[in-house]
């Protein structure tokens, strides 16, 4: 175990090993916040390259969630909508400007590819030069606030699995552990395994 000193605060990290694979779990240094928002839906459709009926899920709102880094969160109708996304960066910037955010978006649906997943997500951030990210831990951390608001989980430990990066051919699995008490989030952890995608040496 060790602590990472990040801008958001000290992040406790625990490394474990099982079957030759290593797993890291991080405790969120601050509880995430949730703010329901209503972006311009016509602009949002243009930004995502989707029809209006592909955006949204019954009982799910658009939001901005923040666990140190704020993310606009948008529900989509299913896996087909997720696969149909064609980002228009200019329209995305105009759309997110209406809710005071930059050109980035974290989209999700409850229809999943893997049977043990709870959410299928994609993250686009042209504002920061990221066409698409295969695994976004900071967004998953923020998304715990959205889960609390939408699902209203019962007290105790609640576990969720997020799948991401499948459309990119770089699948990732992010695990969330929520400690709920009195109907409120008391603590949250994110975790997962990693594989080497690049390596090298620094000459000092």
Label for each model-derived stretch:
Residues 1-204:
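Active-site proximal loop and beta-alpha junction motif in alpha/beta enzyme cores
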């Amino acid at each position: 175990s060790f602590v990472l000193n990040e801008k958001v605060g000290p992040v406790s990290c625990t490394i474990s090993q099982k079957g030759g694979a290593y797993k890291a779990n991080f405790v969120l240094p601050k509880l995430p916040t949730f703010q329901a928002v209503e972006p311009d839906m016509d602009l949002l459709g243009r930004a995502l390259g989707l029809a209006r009926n592909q955006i949204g899920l019954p009982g799910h709102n658009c939001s901005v969630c923040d666990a140190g880094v704020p993310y606009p969160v948008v529900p989509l109708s299913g896996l087909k909508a997720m696969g149909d996304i064609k980002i228009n960066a200019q329209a995305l910037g105009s759309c997110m400007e209406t809710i005071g955010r930059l050109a980035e978006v974290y989209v999700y649906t409850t229809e999943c590819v893997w049977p043990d997943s709870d959410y299928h997500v994609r993250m686009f951030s042209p504002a920061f030069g990221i066409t698409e990210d295969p695994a976004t831990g900071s967004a998953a951390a923020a998304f715990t606030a959205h889960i609390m608001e939408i699902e209203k989980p019962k007290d105790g430990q609640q576990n969720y699995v997020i799948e991401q990066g499948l459309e990119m051919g770089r699948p990732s699995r992010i695990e969330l552990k929520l400690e709920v008490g009195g109907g409120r989030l008391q603590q949250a952890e994110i975790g997962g395994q990693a594989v080497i995608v690049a390596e090298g040496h620094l000459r000092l």
